[in-house]
Amino acid sequence: MDFESSSAGPSTSYAEEPCTLSMLPQVSAVLSETSITESNVSCQLHPSRSAALNDNVRTLIYNRTDPHIQLDMRAFYNCMEYEEALQPNYHYFTGVQENITPFHREQAIDWIYDVAKEENCDGDVFLLAVSLIDRFMSVQNILKHDIQMIAGVALFIASKLKAPHPMTASKIAYYSDNSCPIDMILQWELLIVTTLQWETESPTAFSFFDFLASRIPQIHNMRGDFQTVVQKCQKMHKLATLFPSMQCAIGLYYVSNLPTQNKELAVKIKDLLANMFQLEVNLLDSYIPMVQRCMSTTPIYTSEDAEKTEPTPSAPASTQEPEAFQELKELKEEPLPTPPPEEPAFQKLVLLEPIPLSEQTPSTPLNDSGFSSDVSSPASSEKKRRRSTDWFEEDSTPPKIFKTL
């Protein structure tokens, strides 16, 4: 096989010439570490090339367009089908979680975002970590002090799957100021992957970005802005729990309509989104305010006790009775005329004594808390109040991206 013309092996422009025994006197001045053991000769690469291979600044390599994969609609449809099976539950804050709120989630997302940025991780690593966090919290109730551990372990797992240089457990412990011990990180890693049934690899917004960029090459120039927008949107759980294809469409639609972008290119991208995802692109306008909110420097959820606001105290009962009750009371106090006694036609037999009014069953049924059904119990009122707080977003089903076969 000719490796010089194939991408499967190294070419002569990057490989050193083979060292032989006859060349040792000439290369002894260049190579400082050369050992001869019988017929084996170990040579050291040139320092400049060795430094380029071991450079930790660039820890990612963008993939080139493969027309057999990224231009094939079957691969695109497979990603869309796969994302439906691994979508997180948007309502897990009210249906599963009892101790954490979107405020705690936003803090954890901000932390792993800073860690991924410090480690020069690809944007795909961070998106996969957020997906693992939301999927795990969709099925498992956790405590408040475990959210940082779960976020760090999710980034640890995602770096193993996506990063060329995976992060180690010691780095996660270091960035957490040793609040996440190494042994606990490994235990939580096993718990998360078993809870998710080892389905840790899921499509992200970048998976669909590559499909779109392969059809319009100018989209590659938007990768930096697209990565920033999609990563910032992960702070809001309503956007983060959308389908990755929907996140890609929202992010690319937002970036293409920035004032610095070409208007003709924005029209092409709009048509491409409509053709690829089979959706009305105008529906994406409803998500633009949420994206702008995520892009701002202010936190989305400003207080961790936003959902724990004290109930509004009711006004004290007035000691003065209403006029209607006073009139009714005056009517009751007036003596009523006594009718003349009548002879009973027959003697009434009293079989059962009437039940006292105080012991009768109330007209309204009682609930399990002992309160009347028209008055909520403290637990139920707390639950209703939590569902109507400021941090809970309006429940609206996002437009579904549907496929055409």
From Swiss-Prot:
PROSITE patterns: CYCLINS. Residues 326-335 have a biased composition (Basic and acidic residues). GO terms for molecular function: cyclin-dependent protein serine/threonine kinase regulator activity. This is G1/S-specific cyclin-D. InterPro entries: Cyclin, Cyclin-like_dom, Cyclin-like_sf, Cyclin_N, Cyclins_cyclin-box. Interacts with cdk-4; the interaction is likely involved in regulating cdk-4 activity. Disulfide bonds: none annotated. The keyword Calcium does not apply. Keywords: Cell cycle, Cell division, Cyclin, Differentiation, Gonadal differentiation. It holds the Pfam family Cyclin_N. One of its GO terms (biological process) is sex determination. Changing residue 205 to T: In q626; in both hermaphrodites and males, impaired gonad development due to a failure to generate distal tip cells (DTC). In association with cdk-4, regulates the progression through the G1 phase of the cell cycle during postembryonic development. Regulates proliferation of the coelomocyte lineage and intestinal cells during late embryogenesis. In complex with cdk-4, involved in sex determination during gonadogenesis by regulating the asymmetric division of the somatic gonadal precursor cell (SGP). Transmembrane segments: none annotated. Residues 301-405 are annotated as: Disordered. SMART domains: CYCLIN. Belongs to the cyclin family. Cyclin D subfamily. Residues 311-321, 358-380 have a biased composition (Polar residues). Residues 76-200 form the Cyclin N-terminal domain. GO terms for cellular component: cyclin D1-CDK4 complex; cyclin-dependent protein kinase holoenzyme complex; cytoplasm; microtubule organizing center; nucleus. It comes from the Eukaryota.
